[in-house]
Amino acid sequence: MDDMLIVTTNEVAGYRIVEVYGEVFGLTTRSRNLFSSAGQQMKTVVGGEINGYTKLQHDTRETSIGRMKEEAKAKGANAIVAMRFDSSTFQNIDSVAAYGTAVKIEKI
């Protein structure tokens, strides 16, 4: 396995957990572009996807996952189980936390 395996389940089919390193997380907080936000407000009136916010959320989640993976690798893990997201928004600031349990797995 070349890269970090990340799953939302507590186990990985075909593997066994041989060591548990504990909780790991990656946190990203970003502010929205005020000029972009003004244009996106019109979308809330007429309906439809708000592309700017969708991209912001996607990028923020990807960054959070990357930071979580770095923390897990630093602990010696090769997988993360029970991965979840938590997010919050306050005014023009979006925060996303990716978290899970860092483990070492090996093929059965």
UniProtKB/Swiss-Prot annotation:
InterPro entries (alphabetical): UPF0145_dom_sf, UPF0145_YbjQ-like
| Taxonomy, superkingdom | Bacteria
Q: Write down a Pfam family by its short name.
A: YbjQ_1
Give the family per the record.
Belongs to the UPF0145 family.
Q: What is this protein called?
A: UPF0145 protein llmg_1596
Source organism (scientific name): Lactococcus lactis subsp. cremoris (strain MG1363)
